[in-house]
Every structure is written in structure tokens, then in C-alpha cells.
Amino acid sequence: MTIGERIKSARIGAGLSQRNLAREMGLSAMAISKYENGEIVPRSGLLIQMSEILGVNVDYFFRSISVNLSEPQYRCRKPLKKKEANQVHAKVREWLERHLEIELILGEERTLTLPSKETCRVASPDGIEDAARRVRDEWSLGLDPIENVMDVLEQHGIRVGVIDAPDTFDALTFYYDDNTPVIAVNNDTPGDRQRFNLAHELGHLLLQVEGGVDEEAAAHRFAAAFLVPKEMAFRELGQRRRNISPREFYLLKHKWGMSMSAWLHRAAELGIISKSTAERLWTLFNQNKWREREPGVPLPQEHPTNMKLLVLRALSEKKISTSRAQELLGGEQPGEQCVESF
């Protein structure tokens, strides 16, 4: 990407129009347009000012690496406006470039170890349950709660990023260079919903849907089955129930890292509770607005660790400076003092 293209991408990522950026900088919109079109290269002082306004490091404008992204699949509670979608796309691109750059600096190649297409070919709800179980088996996850979903995905070669995005955005999945899957999730999301979104996007990556099965519904079922295998759901709740208390859902949420609402949905789809019982419980959830904000202590968010570990390794081995490490971490302090204290 040229400097002009990077200015445009950073502006879109910041959610600013050319006119808004020009106003912030005390310039004309025409000047910004000329910068973005490559007609004029802004002097260093303007680039520094621009980087501060757009929330990027000035080195971003001179970054050599760029990526080709496939059309992303968004998971949102309501459709994103075009401006919002462009903003999310630009932020993901900027994060991924930093991720790939530190891999390049270290000569690190991530091995992608996904289950085969045959493993994930599904044509029915039972097939989805079986596929989720096979994925757990291939990844040696057993039947216990998954401690950290992000770590599991990163360990198998999927790049996982967390970005600031509109409230309605949950997650997106895409490929870069046609062969490496990437999942990005909203930074402002409770841990239980974040984990479900990651598992849902994993479903989109893996499932080979056949027989008229709805892809979105299949990914939703896969996410629940991946987080809580049906054998364990029956063990926790029993085979048949006439009622389940909210307190049970709350305790299971913190044990398994899956929301109370998802547990209610899981109990219904496995036939543990009847349709009428599920409707009564959903009414209770709606009355208390628990579908918007669940009661009690929220589940902590997960954070990707692979990129930070690579940056710290490069810093420890003197392959990058502290300021470069901070730039690669998106402005976050690398914690060099902490590293040196050990």
C-alpha cells in the first residue's frame, strides 16, 4: 500500500470523513483528498499529527507489508452500516498487518491444523453435534470445559484479533492470501458471548453444510456443542427437566464459559426441557432483561496471547526496539521492565 492508501485506510478505521479529518488538522478536504490519491506526500510533521488523530503509530504509514483479504462474513445483532463495515474492515487489516510483520521479523510460520472437510460434513442437527465432538477429539480437548477458546484457535493456526468496533458487531471471519483463516471479535463483549462468537465463527470455517441445513443455524448449534458437548449437558442438567432455575444457569455459565441464554437454548434444543418450559423461561429472561445483560458477575474476557509473545520474544532477542514493540502491539506498552525483572 502507498502512503496515500494507508492514510485513507487509517481514516476509515477511525470513522472519519475527509472533511472531518481536514477539520481536525486545520486543512482543507481537498488537501486530504490529494494526500490519499498520492498527488501530494504530506511532510513528516503532518504525518505525526495525522497519526495522533487517527490513532495509529507514524510507522504505520511506511509499513511495507500489506494483505489481501477475502470478503468477510460478519456476525452482528443487526446489519452494519456501510461506514461501520468499512471501519471494522480497516481496523482488522491494520491489526493483521502488525501480526504478520512480527511473524516475518522472527521467521515464524504458523502451521494450520484444521480437521478435514469430511470430518465436518453435516446434513442434520445430530451431524452437527457429531462434528463438534470430532473436532474436540482431533484437537485433544476431551469433554471438559475449554479453559481458553482463543488459545485453542491460535494453537491450531487461526489468527485471532480483538478490535474496537460498534456495539452491534460481534465477530467476523475471513481468509487472507486465500488460505489462512482469521477471526476478529469485538473488544467490548462479555467473555461468555465472546467465547460463543469465536466458536460460532469456527463453525463457519469448518462446517461443510449439506441437505438444505441453514448455515447460520448450523454454526450456532456447532458453537453450543463445541463449548458444551451434549453428553456433558445431560450430565449437568439431567435427561429431562420440568424446570431449571436461573441460579443453575448462572453457575453453569461460570463453569463452562457459555452464557445463561445459550444454556437455556441448549437445554431446549437437546430436549431436556419442553417447548412450553423454554417459552416460560424465555419470558422470565425477557422480563428481567437478562438477554441484554445477564445477572451477577460477568465472565472475564479472553485475550489473544500469540502476537504479544512473539513481540516480547523479538524484544528480548534485540531484534526490535521498545518503540517498535509498542508500535507492533498497537500502542500498548510491551512491559520490558517486567521481562527484565525475571
Residue ranges: model-predicted function:
Residues M1-F342:
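Active-site hotspot residues in diverse enzymes, especially metal/ion-binding acidic/histidine motifs
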